Regions:
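Inter-Walker segment of RecA-like/P-loop motor cores
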Residues: 94-145, 390-395
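Conserved coupling segment at the C-terminus of the helicase ATP-binding
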Residues: 55, 59, 148-151, 156-359, ...
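Conserved pre-motif I regulatory segment
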Residues: 2-57
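Conserved Walker A/P-loop ATP-binding site and its immediately adjacent core
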Residues: 65-107, 129-132, 286-294, 364-372
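Conserved RecA-like ASCE ATPase "motif II neighborhood" in helicase/translocase motors
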Residues: 120-156, 160-167, 263-268, 403-413
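Conserved RecA-like P-loop NTPase helicase motor core
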Residues: 395-482, 728-729, 749, 764
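Catalytic core segments in nucleotide and nucleic-acid processing enzymes
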Residues: 369, 386-397, 424, 450, ...
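Conserved helix-turn-beta segment of the N-terminal RecA-like "Helicase ATP-binding" lobe
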Residues: 90-115, 295-304, 377-383
Length: 839
């Protein structure tokens, strides 16, 4: 007779709660068992499942998506409430749903689906869908009933947070009626804060950034509200306005020629009650070093964030050989690596034009369209975010060749043959106004360096997706080479990535100074799975363990506390909390920035004390807001002995000769002609160039809001007043630029009595515009002169690196300064030329 299956197992109807058991019971599970690391993570989460915030850290490709889906299903089975799985974008959300289908787990993409509302299916959607001012989940004050959630799983949390920050950042675009109103309202304040930056904004220089002083911003809130509120429903404003309107007085307001950007110090995440009040919040992250952003942006419990859930071993990472060609041999320039990448894509391992190995997919990550242009002669495809999904699908389907991806360093899944060679050609630079201003304020600080290393590690993780995967990673450019060579920067990498970098350095040591053939051989060992390389790679990771505790910076915790106090009107308490934050950091640049924020809170209750505090902030960080009373330029004294000053600076900066050469090359590479977006980096590079050569150098325009881009003290009696126009694309020096240079000379003479000024213009042309008049005695550094200077400075570094610490030896430095014609007294006679009248 037929079996009555309804009676089989009828005595046990309780839903399974342990994620491992849920997986084991799936009828169509793709693998018999979960990977060991996944099982460990799921068991440890289950033990802590009642914690409101849980961070799960695994190496890239460690199976976090499957773990997150099983955790969501477990919470549904337990009856805690509805489950939402958040991906950074729609492309990744579709990938997650496909993974769930493969597992046999019920999901939906529709928040109104009854299966989600009744707790039968996991809602898979984007962070943007939940976090926006018109959220279907409800926004505080919108009159709608917020959706109660049992669990929110945030996949690729650090990438998702970029979306969250964007939703709490309101940009009033140039051309919008409110933009002109805001500029008119604060024009006088902006000009007082930085006359040059304000003039640049009005001249449509999109690199110019100037902050509206917080005391002016707070004093005119009624006018600001009158300018913005009528446009609350406009495109570009309506999704952000409801989230920040209540904290508008606390926002930093930053002006560029492209818009006015309003951004709160921390995200008022309580505006999204579905997330803020969710019973459980799980953050899936890679092994990035700093989790402070989970506290500042999402108000996660810092004590819980500091207790991440991890596997027992960090050896679940795929095999990567990470090489920086320029660190192996200075002659291996970027163009040589581009040719090599093309040959690898074609299977031409030995570079003789005839394929001798299987062709592979080579993926190149670049930060901008401009950077992608250099790859155009070699690329089979160039993808931007809008067409990335189709591009990734094509790579997964088979051999494509060399594929360039523009400004996508996270959230891209390139398993197996989809990517066997990954090239990082630069890292994304700050694009929004607040980030650009913060990057300038924190320039050279350990905090900014840690952020850059985090982005580099994110990029390097794209090419391996599980422990059986393998990939060669090539790092282009000196700045990326420094990241893997400099011990301080390597220490900022996660343990597993650091171990792979250390192993790859052993390979690099074997082929140091050799040419492309040796590099090809090393790459082949990884691609061909040479048993000796594979064994060494696995051995390097075998003993690596995840960190027992997560990194949450103390100042991040107190900054969050201060913001929450300020948002409820307790400004004095907020200022007191920020005082604790400033005592918890050693980096003076960050302390200055924190003091600036403390002054902003204090200004609500004691404006005079706020101005005094801002003066203290300026002593720690010369690039914070200048007090309302202004700043008197500091005395500028030339180095008594140029060679001694240079040797002391180089000794402080560089631990070994390779670091010196790479560091100098990275510095020189920051000067890019014809790219306005790189102007600020060029100005910073010129200042650091002076320090490398033993010349006292500053950036008055950044320090005081007026004066030249660079000021070099060639001697106590003579200054070089330097204006940089590297971003110009004109064939002559404009009258306005000449007038600016003349004004900077007058500023120098006024502020430093008895000094003679040498006017210097860094410009793509030495030809004066017909309407312009040269500043008396001026010199012009043209691209040709710059190339000669680069060659001399590079030779200076190479000569000092060739020996046992010669860069620390004053006599050796003096000799090389003389050989390179880099002495302060004659520097601009050699590496600049006189201006020419237009024909």
């Amino acid at each position: 007779m037929p079996l009555d299956w309804s009676r089989v197992g009828a005595g046990n109807k309780d839903p399974l709660l342990r994620p491992r058991e849920i997986y084991a019971a799936l009828p169509n599970r793709p693998w018999p068992y979960l990977r060991h690391e996944q099982g460990e993570v799921l068991e440890r989460w289950f033990e802590r499942r009642t914690d409101r915030d849980v961070v799960i850290k695994q190496n890239t490709g460690g199976g976090k998506t499957v773990a997150g889906l099983l955790i969501a299903r477990s919470t549904l089975n337990e009856g805690v409430g509805k489950a939402v799985y958040l991906a950074p974008d729609t492309y990744l959300a579709r990938q997650v749903r496909a993974e769930a289908d493969r597992l046999g787990l019920a999901t939906t993409g529709d928040p109104d689906d009854l299966a989600f509302r009744s707790g039968q299916a996991i809602l898979v959607t984007t962070f943007h869908k939940l976090i926006n001012g018109k959220s279907v989940f409800g926004v505080t004050g919108d009159g709608r009933q917020a959706i109660d959630l049992g669990i929110v799983v945030v996949d690729d949390a650090h990438a998702a947070l970029a979306t969250a920050e964007g939703q709490f950042r309101l940009t009033v675009a140039a051309g919008h009626p409110a933009y002109a109103k805001l500029l008119a309202l604060f024009a006088t304040d902006l000009e007082q804060q930085s006359p040059k930056a304000w003039a640049d904004v009005r001249a449509q220089d999109f690199t110019a950034v100037v902050r509206i002083p917080f005391w002016s911003w707070q004093a005119r809130q009624s006018e600001v509200m009158a300018a913005l509120h009528p446009h609350a429903g406009d495109d570009g404003i309506k999704f952000e306005w409801p989230l920040i309107a209540d904290v508008l007085p606390l926002c930093a307001a930053t002006v560029t020629s492209r818009g006015v950007e309003l951004r709160p110090p921390c995200l008022p995440i309580a505006m999204i009650p579905a997330f803020d009040k969710a019973a459980r919040r799980v953050y899936l992250t890679a092994t990035l070093a700093d989790d402070s952003i989970l506290v500042t942006d999402l108000d996660a419990d810092p004590k819980l964030v500091q207790r991440p859930v991890t596997p027992g071993s960090a050896s679940d990472l795929g095999d990567r050989m990470i090489l920086a060609p320029v660190a192996l041999n200075r002659s291996l320039d970027d163009e040589a690596v581009r040719v090599l990448a093309r040959q690898l894509a074609d299977g031409d391992r030995d570079g003789d034009g005839v394929p001798d190995a299987p062709p592979v997919n080579v993926v190149v990550l670049v930060p901008s369209t401009r950077a992608a242009a250099a790859w155009a002669p070699y690329a089979d495809r160039v993808h931007h975010v809008r067409d990335l999904e189709a591009g990734v699908a094509e790579l997964k389907a088979g051999h494509v060749g060399l594929v360039v991806m523009v400004n996508k360093y996270d959230g891209v899944d390139l398993p197996g043959d989809a990517c066997r060679v990954l090239v990082l050609d630069g890292v994304p630079r700050p694009m929004d106004a607040t980030e650009r201003r913060e990057a300038a304020v924190l320039s050279g600080s350990p905090t900014l360096l840690a952020r850059q290393i985090q982005r580099i590690e994110q990029g390097m993780g794209r090419g391996v997706r599980d422990s059986e995967d393998h990939c060669v990673v090539l790092l282009l450019g000196s700045d990326l080479a420094v990241a893997t060579h400099d011990q301080r920067q390597r220490a900022l990498l996660s343990p597993a990535t650091r171990a792979q970098v250390e192993l790859s350095r052993d390979i690099a040591d074997l082929i140091q100074g050799e040419g492309l053939d040796s590099l090809r051989s090393a790459i082949g060992a990884c691609l061909d799975r040479d048993p000796q390389w594979v064994a060494a790679s696995r051995r390097a990771l075998a003993e690596i363990r995840y960190a027992d505790s997560g990194v949450v910076r103390p100042e991040a915790v107190t900054s969050r506390q201060a913001f929450d106090l300020a948002a409820t009107g307790r400004q004095r308490d907020a200022a007191d909390a920020m005082q604790r934050a400033t005592t918890e950091v050693e980096d003076p640049a960050v302390r200055g920035l924190l003091l600036e924020q403390r002054a902003a809170y204090l200004n609500h209750v004691d404006p005079a004390a706020a101005q005094r505090m801002l003066t203290r902030a300026l002593e720690l960080n010369q690039f914070v807001l200048r007090p309302a009373a202004g700043v008197v330029p500091a005395q500028l004294r030339a180095a008594a002995v140029q060679a001694k000053a240079a040797a002391e600076f180089l000794d402080q900066e560089y631990a070994d000769g390779v670091s010196l050469v790479l560091g100098v090359k990275a510095l020189l590479d920051e000067v890019v002609w014809g790219d306005e977006e790189r102007s600020d980096e060029a100005e910073a590079a010129w200042m650091r160039l002076g320090l490398h050569l033993g010349v006292t150098s500053t950036r008055p325009e950044k320090l005081y809001g007026t004066g030249p881009d660079n000021l070099w003290a060639l001697s106590d009696e003579r200054h070089a007043v330097i204006e940089l126009k590297t971003g110009c694309t004109t064939g002559s020096i404009a009258k306005s630029d000449l007038d600016q240079l003349g004004g900077s000379v007058r500023w120098d003479v006024t502020n430093y009595s008895g000094v003679k000024s040498l006017a210097v213009m860094v410009h793509p042309s030495a030809v004066l515009h017909g309407l312009g008049t040269a500043v008396e005695g001026m010199r012009v550094v043209t691209p040709q002169k710059w190339e000669a200077l680069k060659k001399a400075v590079t030779a200076f570094a190479v000569a000092l690196a060739d020996g046992n610490g010669r860069w620390r030896d004053e006599q050796a430095v003096a000799e090389q300064l003389a050989v390179g014609k880099l002495l302060a007294g004659s520097f601009f006679q050699t590496y600049a030329e006189a201006p020419k009248q237009a024909a």
